[in-house]
């Protein structure tokens, strides 16, 4: 219920949770987690999953209509697939704790340029430092336990920037798994004495992080 102070009783807020059977349930920290959609009594979306599911269904319906016009009557469904490569920065926890801007905003708000940035692209696909490699190995194993098929890790263009690429899957599942991936990244980084920065532009003058 939503205690908004309105005239309607809180138990009549009328939000409905529905299990999303198209996305896998999983166990995290001994808790069964079930992906769900949340909508109002009138059908209005109250979450971010419902619009995604409706968009996928609308795309399927209209794409099938066009395909059938071309005479391909044997096609029964059109599904989108996504494999979002997650970019991130790893920063030593001791260094991170010295920067209040990183702590409070997830990015630097002031500072000087480093002596060397991402010139010559020597960090991109370069040798992975042992500490980072240990983090990546641990991260893979944690994600596999949750059914997230992490496949490829490598250094990205900017210093201390890295990337994880999962095996592609349907758009709805990929969106759920990307949320899990970001959460687990931060937990595993902490175990290795580091902080995982997922802000889209944590440092000025070098590449930001995204999903592509």
Please report, for each region that a protein language model flagged, where it lies by residue.
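Glycine-rich, acidic/polar active-site loops that bind/position phosphate-bearing ligands
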Residues: 1-198, 206-211
